[in-house]
From Swiss-Prot:
Domain of life: Eukaryota
Record's compositionally biased regions (Gly residues): 115-124, 521-536
Region annotated Disordered, chain positions: 111-134, 306-336, 500-536
The entry's keywords: Signal
Leader peptide range in chain numbering: 1-22
Protein name according to UniProt: Glycine-rich extracellular protein 1
Keyword rRNA processing: no
Name of the gene this protein is made from: GREP1
Length: 536
């Protein structure tokens, strides 16, 4: 701006009346004229002005003179035309003037956009090269920057490679996709009004994929197998809006049609879990936004290959969201043969009885302090298999209870721990024939328990019939036992402990006191009330 302001000011100064009339007014008398007229036509001082340096001219309608008018500083070299110099190429006066006086016409660029050569309205000089664009002459259009070669506007024009509005230049071969004629290389896709390429600001599609919204087949290719939209029948293969392509092969494992049975067993009865948005006429592919399926099982339940909306691909052998069953177990329809459904006998592990001591609890023997069973012929009795409630494998030597009274087998009711072999429980459940290894006493045939079923049962051992010097057969058996705990327990038994009168054929042992019949005690054997063995 500074370079152009100084010539403009000089031009305005030179247009004053004094300059147009031949220079400055006459000097007062007494002042000599040294070099000639002061009108700018001669060389020298005029009116006390310093002499000008040669080579400078006044350029606004004046002749070429080596001085300045009105005390102005000389111009720098290189601007406009010099005195006697030929026309400078590429520079004009910039104000519509054709040429300077004396100097010849200025040669330079051809006319641009209706302007003469030079600057148009304070703009910078144009660079040569651009061709005519959009009906304009080469150069600037208003304040717009020059266009790059090869690009043209595409709004309202034929589809040509270049800009569309404010968009970046398209790659060759792509159309604008907004009703303009399509470019060669790609044909129209998906029965849309768009040409191949970009639609609006959308990126161009890759070859081979369609919109899948009731679109036609791909150009140059037949119907793509295993691809579909899934939103209605008759949908052509392709991609659903914003969806990834399907991988072929996987069927919808939703329990319809032939396929997996219950618990992943082929051929079994089918359950039909509810799967959202799975219709019988849906074509293969995704419903909604789903990941691609992995190839695998064939189509099931009348559907084509694909998966339900929001569901991950199923693994072979699964139905819906059910996990595969382990071998031997069924699913929701009763147990299959296995160790926990009472169809297979549980595993029996024999164990040895552990010695114990009498308990202070009522009944003679508690649940945690039972002595081992008696020894027969120097051997332990064989264990008997049994199970209790809960269907867990039972320990060897127990059987489930089957009732009360006579004939009750060893074991307990539900919730009770099993008894160790060799003793009764003392609650009236077990009778004289409790243990298979114990033999009835002579004279105790058909014994069926105690009176009121709440007494303490006398131990029944094979050697119980042997007479003891103290007159107590049970104490003698305990003293002669091989177990120290039984010997100590037998020593505490008092004479006169016999079976009560509930035994029909009961009679006193030889050498012992008579049995007291009709006693008020629960045992009817001389003991009144409940009394543990040897502790009354």
């Amino acid at each position: 701006m500074g370079a152009w302001a100084f010539p403009a000011a000089l031009f305005l100064l030179c247009l004053t009346s004094e300059s147009l009339q031949g220079g400055l007014p006459l000097l007062p008398p007494g002042l000599g004229k040294v070099y000639g007229p002061h009108s700018g036509l001669g060389a020298g001082y005029d009116g006390g002005v310093k002499p000008q340096k040669p080579g400078f001219v006044v350029r606004h309608g004046l002749g070429t003179q080596p001085d300045t008018e009105g005390g102005m500083k000389p111009q720098n070299l290189g601007f406009r035309t010099f005195a006697g110099a030929a026309a400078q190429p590429g520079y004009g006066n910039g104000l519509g003037a054709a040429a300077f006086p004396v100097a010849g016409a200025q040669s330079g660029p051809a006319a641009q956009n209706g302007f003469g050569p030079g600057f148009g309205g304070g703009g910078k000089p144009q660079k040569p090269g651009p061709t005519t664009q959009n009906g304009y002459r080469p150069g600037y259009v208003g304040a717009v920057k020059p266009q790059k070669p090869g690009f043209q506007y595409r709004i309202g024009l034929g589809a040509q490679p270049g800009f569309r509005g404010d968009m970046k230049a398209q790659e060759p071969g792509l159309g604008n996709g907004n009703g303009l004629s399509a470019q060669p290389v790609l044909t129209a896709q998906n029965r849309f009004g768009f040409g191949a390429g970009l639609g609006g600001n959308v990126k161009p599609l890759k070859p081979g994929y369609g919109k899948r919204l009731r679109a036609g087949a791909f150009p140059g290719a037949g119907t793509q197998p295993e691809y579909g939209h899934g939103n209605g029948p008759g949908v052509q293969p392709g991609l659903g809006a914003g969806m990834k392509p399907q991988m072929p092969g996987l069927g919808a494992p939703n329990g319809y049609g032939p396929g997996r049975g219950r618990a992943g067993v082929p051929g079994g009865p089918e359950r039909r879990p509810w799967v959202p948005h799975l219709l019988p006429f849906s074509s293969p592919g995704y419903l909604g936004v789903m990941k691609a399926q992995k190839p695998g099982p064939l189509a099931q339940n009348g559907y084509r290959a694909g998966a339900g909306e929001g569901m991950k691909p199923q693994k072979p052998g699964l139905r819906g969201t059910l996990k595969p069953q382990k071998s031997g177990h069924g699913h929701e329809n009763g147990p299959w043969p296995g160790p926990c459904n009472a169809r297979v006998a549980p595993m029996l592990l024999p164990r040895l009885p552990t010695p114990g001591v009498p308990s202070d609890k009522e009944g003679g023997w508690g649940l945690k302090s039972q002595p081992p069973s008696a020894v027969q012929n120097g051997k332990l009795p064989a264990p008997m298999p049994a199970i209790q409630w809960g269907l867990k494998p039972q320990k060897a030597g127990h059987q489930p209870p089957n009732g009360y009274g006579p004939g009750a087998e060893p074991g307990f009711n539900g919730g009770l721990e099993p008894q160790k072999i060799g003793l009764g429980y003392g609650n009236g459940v077990l009778g004289a024939r409790v243990f298979p290894e114990a033999h009835p006493q002579p004279g105790f045939h058909g014994a069926n328990g105690f009176r009121n079923r709440d007494g303490v049962e006398a131990l029944v051992y094979p050697k119980a019939a042997a007479l003891a010097p103290e007159g107590n057969g049970q104490a003698g058996v305990l003293w002669n036992s091989r177990w120290p705990t039984l010997q100590a327990w037998g020593a505490g038994l008092k004479p006169g402990y016999q079976a009560g009168d509930e035994y029909a054929e009961a009679r006193s042992q030889p050498g012992g006191p008579d049995v007291k019949r009709g006693s008020n005690g629960q045992l009817g054997n001389g003991y009144g009330g409940r009394c543990p063995l040897g502790k009354c």
